[in-house]
Amino acid sequence: MNRIHAVILDWAGTTVDFGSFAPTQIFVEAFRQAFDVEITLAEARVPMGLGKWQHIEALGKLPTVDARWQAKFGRAMSAADIDAIYAAFMPLQIAKVVDFSSPIAGVIDTIATLRAEGIKIGSCSGYPRAVMERLVPAAAEHGYRPDHWVATDDLVAGGRPGPWMALQNVIALGIDAVAHCVKVDDAAPGISEGLNAGMWTVGLAVSGNEFGATWDAYQTMSKEDVAVRREHAASKLYAAGAHYVVDSLADLPEVIAHINARLAQGERP
């Protein structure tokens, strides 16, 4: 049938870890532990969605971080420096990712709704396999069990913004056409991943990295603050090319109904 057959979901900030705090906090700690260099949470969020080694590399190229690094060491960050920060990052992330494994509000019900419509649930992450092997069973204990998952270091071709993790889900799930898939993500590299794979793309403006608030903080925010943060996040996701932007995964079934209507009319991503 000419309809959506699969969704490929990101993890942190999309299905678990409202606000995507597990990786951002660990980047701050890893820079401090490896080289006694301070970075802010806001800086740590900028390259979110990339593989973690590539994320550290991108952080080193941020003008503010590069200026601090140059002031301390008199040179730009090297590949060996990135390796050292990554070596500090990995055990910290593996140790703490389970603490951020609870599904975001609405995720479990949304997955049930999608499966009732015959939609398969794929997933992929900027986390490496060593982290995912801790996160996946922890999320399963909370009730979130996708049909397939791919880690950023699983494939020789690489991770985001390339299409390969999303396409590996297509293969594993046996989907007949990429136009029958939706890639859902809270960060720009994940939107690019979906577009490069030829899929429909949905950005999440409130639950994830760009909004950047904990669930408790979000619950107590003024409507004005929410609106400003939502607009900031949505603008970045639309700029990345997202076909749709909604607040969280709870809004996805309505979007899929809209996409199905477009597919029925012969439209493609």
Curated annotation (Swiss-Prot):
Its EC number is 3.11.1.1. The keyword Magnesium applies. It comes from the Bacteria. Transmembrane segments: none annotated. It catalyses: phosphonoacetaldehyde + H2O = acetaldehyde + phosphate + H(+). CDD domains: HAD_PHN (cd02586). This is Phosphonoacetaldehyde hydrolase. It comes from Salmonella typhi. The gene is phnX.
